[in-house]
């Protein structure tokens, strides 16, 4: 069932920031303090019993049709992958195939789920869907163009944004999924090297990263680098309290070229690769 989210109403007097914009350290520290003070579970109490380490990959979905068109797609728009996005997802899956992936969690939205499905095919592991991982509800901004707000001028009437999901709601969802993640990790029973993959969205992922690091009692990086499509943040979490974070891992995407004309079109699972067609001719 859809989650109940807190919404807020805003009036934009300035150009709204795009989701991929870098986030300053000041904002990150403020959010980290909010999260850290709110957690009641201290995992250091379990460190003497469990010295396990596990890896968590926080993946942003591959390129979607709305990414290409420059259209805002939050929780209300269920955007599909493009053909290029599908190729990105396959390359991503191939690049992490040697990890010991226990399971994949995904947002129910198509762009995330399709990306997650490619990973599960390679990893041969279960896929779990969680509404906690959905993108931010953009309210009345859903379906609007980035180009429109980029051309917005203060002398024009203020743009009133309604039903925008609040930061508190995003933090609550991030905490909720963090509980699921750490409960899964506790089940590793002293094993190390296990990996959990989480596929979500560009606006929500920084909130999830903060929640996870707060739970792990690990300082935030000096800056959270925005996720590119089909890139991931790698977190090696030591249940004893230390974690290592690598941001925006995307070397696996090198060499992928957008297919002319078709690359930006919506991916259709019924379509067959041209290589398969050519093989039948031989």
From Swiss-Prot:
Its main location: nucleus. SUPFAM superfamilies: Phosphoglycerate mutase-like (SSF53254). The keyword Hydrolase applies. It is found in: Nucleus. The record marks 201 as: Transition state stabilizer. The keyword Nucleus applies. One of its GO terms (molecular function) is phosphatase activity. GO terms for cellular component: cytoplasm; nucleus. Its EC number is 3.1.3.-. The active site is at 61 (tele-phosphohistidine intermediate), 135 (proton donor/acceptor). It holds the Pfam family His_Phos_1. It is an enzyme of class 3 (hydrolase). InterPro entries: His_Pase_superF_clade-1, His_PPase_superfam, Phosphoglycerate_Mutase. Signal peptide: none annotated. Keywords: Hydrolase, Nucleus. PANTHER family: FRUCTOSE-2,6-BISPHOSPHATASE TIGAR. Belongs to the phosphoglycerate mutase family. BPG-dependent PGAM subfamily. This is Probable phosphatase C1620.13. It comes from Schizosaccharomyces pombe (strain 972 / ATCC 24843).
């Amino acid at each position: 069932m859809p989650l109940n989210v807190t919404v807020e109403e805003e009036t934009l007097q300035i150009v709204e920031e795009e989701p991929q914009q870098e986030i300053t350290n000041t904002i990150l520290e403020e959010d980290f303090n909010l999260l850290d003070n709110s957690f009641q579970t201290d995992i250091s109490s379990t460190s003497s019993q469990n010295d396990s380490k596990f890896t968590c990959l926080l993946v942003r979905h591959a390129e979607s049709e709305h990414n290409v068109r420059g259209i805002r797609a939050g929780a209300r728009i269920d955007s599909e992958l493009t053909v290029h996005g599908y190729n990105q997802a396959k390359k991503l899956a191939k690049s992490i195939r040697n990890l010991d992936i226990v399971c994949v969690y995904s947002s129910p939205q198509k762009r995330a789920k399709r990306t997650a499905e490619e990973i599960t095919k390679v990893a041969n592991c279960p896929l779990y869907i969680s509404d906690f991982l959905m993108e931010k509800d953009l309210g009345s901004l859903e379906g609007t163009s980035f180009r429109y707000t980029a051309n917005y001028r203060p002398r024009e009437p203020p743009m009133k944004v309604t039903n925008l999901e609040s930061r508190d709601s995003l933090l609550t969802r991030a905490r909720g999924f963090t509980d699921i993640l750490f409960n899964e990790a506790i089940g590793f029973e002293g094993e190390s090297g296990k990996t959990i993959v989480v596929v979500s969205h560009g606006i929500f992922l920084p909130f999830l990263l903060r929640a996870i690091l707060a739970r792990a009692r690990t300082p935030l990086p000096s800056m959270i680098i925005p996720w590119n499509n089909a890139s991931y943040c790698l977190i090696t979490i030591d249940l004893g309290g230390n974690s290592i974070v690598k941001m925006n891992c995307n070397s696996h995407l090198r060499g992928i070229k957008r297919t002319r004309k078709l690359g930006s079109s919506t991916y259709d699972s019924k379509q067959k690769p041209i290589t398969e067609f050519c093989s039948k001719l031989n």
